[in-house]
């Protein structure tokens, strides 16, 4: 594992110069949310595209408007990308960490070209068919990780906005499933819906306090979101 470098994109560029490309970056969004899917993206950018995407950074540091502007640009410049959606039920069954690692494996496996090297943001990903390296602060070191972060974030945010219409009253479009005072108040008032993760203590407490019920006015779960990429 390496830590954030002072040189922007230096690691990814060095791998390409050493002939170890294509380099795939992989990152997740939604790990700490108590509702909604865990979304993982993998992305391969050609070495000639790195400067064209100089605005890339950790998706959480970018404004929503910048992320939305970068989203189609990344998909246009990417040699390959794949976005994986892991539903709440699978997160509950596997646990967040295991689901996260499994999502990273699926995202890399779903790429339309085989990478020569994989850079993951912070987590070691065992079981990959190619060499890999976890990078702390990887969004600032490798453009491919930053691109994966934006793909995952925008994909998840858009889904949470759609989920807000399917499950009104929780404010999913605003807090995106994370624990906020408004979300906690709605959860206490309405009880959990099928998009909540019962492995999270705040959801479990409410479910147990209401006899484990799922609120009657909560519509059925959204259709399974298909993975996407090229």
Curated annotation (Swiss-Prot):
Highest taxon listed in the record's lineage: Bacteria
Cofactor: how and how many bound: Manganese or magnesium. Binds 1 divalent metal ion per monomer in the absence of substrate. May bind a second metal ion after substrate binding.
GO terms classed as biological process: DNA replication, removal of RNA primer; mismatch repair
Primary residence: cytoplasm
Location(s) in or outside the cell: Cytoplasm
Annotated residues for binding of a divalent metal cation: 27-28, 121
Cofactor needs: Mn(2+); Mg(2+)
PROSITE patterns cross-referenced by the UniProt entry: RNASE_H_2
Cellular-component GO terms for this entry: cytoplasm; ribonuclease H2 complex
CDD domains in the cross-refs: RNase_HII_bacteria_HII_like
Family: Belongs to the RNase HII family.
Role, per record: Endonuclease that specifically degrades the RNA of RNA-DNA hybrids.
UniProt-recorded name of the protein: Ribonuclease HII
Protein's organism: Mycobacterium avium (strain 104)
């Amino acid at each position: 594992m390496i830590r954030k470098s002072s040189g922007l994109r230096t690691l990814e560029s060095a791998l390409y110069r050493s002939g170890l490309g294509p380099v795939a970056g992989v990152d997740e969004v939604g790990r700490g949310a108590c509702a909604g899917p865990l979304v993982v993206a993998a992305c391969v950018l050609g070495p000639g595209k790195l400067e064209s995407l100089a605005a890339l950074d950790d998706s959480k540091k970018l404004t929503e408007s910048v992320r939305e502007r970068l989203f189609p640009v990344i998909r246009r410049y990417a040699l390959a990308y794949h976005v994986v959606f892991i539903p709440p039920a699978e997160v509950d069954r596997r646990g967040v960490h295991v689901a996260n690692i499994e999502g990273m494996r699926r995202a890399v496996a779903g790429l339309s070209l085989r990478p020569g090297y994989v850079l993951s943001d912070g987590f070691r990903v065992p079981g990959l068919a190619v060499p890999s390296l976890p990078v702390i602060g990887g969004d600032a070191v490798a453009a491919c990780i930053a691109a994966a972060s934006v793909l995952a974030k925008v994909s998840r945010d858009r889904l949470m906005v759609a989920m807000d219409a399917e499950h009104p009253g929780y404010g999913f479009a605003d807090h995106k499933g994370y624990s906020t005072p408004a979300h906690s108040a709605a959860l206490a008032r309405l009880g959990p819906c099928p998009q909540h993760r019962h492995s999270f203590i705040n959801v479990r407490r409410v479910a147990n306090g209401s006899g484990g019920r799922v609120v009657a006015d909560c519509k059925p779960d959204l259709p399974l979101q298909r993975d996407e990429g090229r």
